[in-house]
């Protein structure tokens, strides 16, 4: 009897509380639903933005891996060139040569691009970077992703090019056409694309938003050698390493090997590339902002 008597007030209180809540809900149902809706949106947004860092990191990893972003890069001192094949020879000569998965020589030179020959209403004359590289390789390093059009073939006589896609978008340029580079040389580009190291890049004099201020043109190595007057010469090499390789040790060996060639060079890692540094730093910075 004591138990029943003690439970009845609790039961009556619960019943009264539910009736009062129901009456209050009916009187303020619009506000209640609005508050619930706002809370649901806030919870969903926080959960979504709170996890952006991980999927952005995974996306970056996949993008760099798909285009075989270099692990190490050899860059000769400005204005220095060396005979094609010598950098590859230096790479093959190091003690840990078996740690190298693939390597490619390049010729990277400054130039200018004039879009006036495209016949558009507006044309631009901007600083440019010509990247002479190998197309159609079975073991590419820093391959070109083609968004539209086609890339040059592996044929020695092919002198077509790929125009960097962000520059083309900034100036609303067509997928293919003919542009002029320094010396009035015509270059026919057949596609728009980008290499992984140019996912982000600085423009002239270190400008950050450089998409429209620097034209990057990817051409076969022989084409850039011809255009720049550096026949048979290179000044750059990019390298990928096998899984588990000691990157720092390989870099030190490469530095010593290139020094023996009698030229000044810088050995940099993929982490030194603007694209890698900025894109990954942005992840952490943005995540801290969303978390705040």
Question: What is the meaning of each model-derived region?
Answer:
Residues 1-292:
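Membrane transport/envelope proteins' first extracytoplasmic loop
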């Amino acid at each position: 009897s004591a138990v029943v008597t003690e439970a009845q007030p609790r039961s009556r209180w619960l019943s009264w509380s539910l009736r009062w809540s129901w009456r209050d809900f009916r009187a303020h149902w619009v506000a209640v639903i609005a508050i619930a809706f706002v809370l649901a949106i806030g919870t969903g947004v926080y959960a979504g933005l709170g996890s952006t860092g991980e999927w952005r990191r995974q996306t970056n990893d996949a993008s760099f891996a798909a285009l075989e972003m270099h692990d190490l890069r050899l860059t000769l001192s400005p204005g220095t060139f060396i005979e094609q094949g010598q950098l590859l020879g230096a790479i093959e000569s190091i003690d840990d040569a078996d740690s190298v998965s693939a390597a490619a020589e390049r010729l990277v030179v400054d130039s200018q691009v004039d879009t006036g020959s495209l016949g558009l209403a507006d044309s631009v004359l901007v600083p440019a970077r010509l990247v002479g590289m190998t197309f159609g390789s079975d073991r590419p390093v820093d391959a070109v992703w083609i968004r539209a059009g086609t890339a040059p073939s592996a044929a020695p006589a092919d002198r077509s090019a790929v125009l960097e896609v962000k520059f083309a978008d900034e100036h609303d340029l067509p997928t293919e056409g003919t542009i002029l580079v320094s010396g009035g040389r015509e270059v026919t580009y057949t596609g728009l694309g980008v290499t992984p190291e140019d996912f982000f890049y600085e423009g002239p004099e270190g400008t950050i938003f450089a998409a429209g201020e620097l034209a990057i043109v990817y051409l076969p190595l022989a084409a850039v050698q011809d255009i720049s007057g550096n026949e048979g010469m290179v000044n750059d090499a990019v390298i990928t390493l096998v899984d588990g390789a000691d990157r720092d040790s390989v870099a030190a060996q490469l530095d010593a090997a290139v020094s023996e060639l009698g030229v000044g060079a810088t050995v940099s890692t993929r982490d030194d590339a603007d694209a890698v540094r900025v894109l990954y730093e942005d992840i952490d910075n943005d995540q801290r902002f969303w978390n705040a």
